[in-house]
Amino acid sequence: SAASDVYKRQDLSYYDRNYTKQELFLNNYTYTNATLNNLWANLYTGIDRANSFLEYIQGSPIDETLIAQYMGEVRFLRAYYFFTLSSLWGDVPLRLKSTRDTDMEALQMPSTPAAEVFDFIVTEMEDVVGQVRTADQLNGPGRISKSTVQGILARVYLKMGGFPLYKGKEAFEKAAYWARKVRNSRLHTLNPDYKEVFTNLS
């Protein structure tokens, strides 16, 4: 199931004998599972913060070039959070305005079909590719680079090619297109040693 993918095939799910994680591993979870509830809440917290940022940044005295870059990074993060949500839960509320705890109408917003959520995701990510900097222009990890957006776009299209959207060949071709963008940038290399996958910074 989608939810069990969070901890699927991981010995770490048993390491600390965390019952809520064991429920996922054993496909024996319910709507009360704390791990899933926390993940859902944290992703929507990130989305709400992104919405607030986008609503208020325009009035900032920050340099316009930096504003454009920051907006691109935040729009990407918001789209990525929706990608994570829809990959795990399918239809989810596509909340694009900041909310308050007392705004019951916004808090009870109905789910949006997964197809529409994914359309929003790719539209946003493709739109911000030109707003963010390349990896060699950033001072170390921790920021959203052009190849970050391109690499995640490849993953999004791979997901769209299979369940539940089944876009097939067209989606897979777009996944290959964005993956080639990362490769052809020549800003990234594969780790020569498998263990370095777990020790090196991405």
Report each predicted region and the residues it spans.
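Extended ligand-binding clefts on enzyme/binding-domain cores
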Residues: 1, 184, 188-202
